[in-house]
Amino acid sequence: FIESHQLQKLDHELTETSVIQHLMIKDIDVILSVVKSSVKKISANGVPVVNGTPDIMNARIEFDNGCVANLTASRISLNPMHKIRIFQRNSYINVNFEENEAHIFQMASGAEKGKGKMTLKLSEGKEKEVFYIKPELSESNGIREEILSFKESIENNIDND
């Protein structure tokens, strides 16, 4: 399953924009690119706190392949946060967009050796080998890149279907 939290401080200029359009749509794009399955069902709830449109929103997306994504977006948070966590068999991925970092925990199959390997002590004397990976992420500004791409497509008459 996938869990997404996009929490931002109140910005009076953005209260007229839907919290879905402003915050949640980016995470929906990321999740759809990762899951690669058709959407089976969507359930959502929102609460207007500041004005007539929802300021806090929660959506649950169920996919045909059994994956479930739970997304929360808020524009009235005291502590900004933007994280996506992916839980799957034998691995856990945590991407922190605010800090521009990612953490991956992956169960070792036994044959791997190398940096980042840890042993977890479990109950009844059992142990599990786990790899911890912290990939290097490039500094990027997605909105700036989208605007530059849009500008380039106009200037060069490029059709980006």
Range-by-range predicted roles:
Residues 1, 156-161:
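Short, intrinsically disordered, charge-balanced linker/junction segments flanking boundaries
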Residues 1-14, 20-21, 27:
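A contiguous active-site-proximal alpha/beta segment in oxidoreductase catalytic domains
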Residues 6-9, 46-49, 109-111:
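Residue-level detector of flexible, active-site-proximal loop/helix-junction positions
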Residues 8-9, 123-130:
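Short, basic/glycine-rich phosphate-binding loops at helix/coil junctions
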Residues 15-21, 132-141:
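A short glycine-threonine-serine/GTX helix/turn-capping micro-motif
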Residues 25-107, 140-158:
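Contiguous beta-strand/loop segments that form the cofactor/metal-binding neighborhood of enzyme cores
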Residues 95, 101-126:
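Mobile, glycine-enriched helix-loop/loop "lid" segments at the mouths of ligand-binding/catalytic clefts
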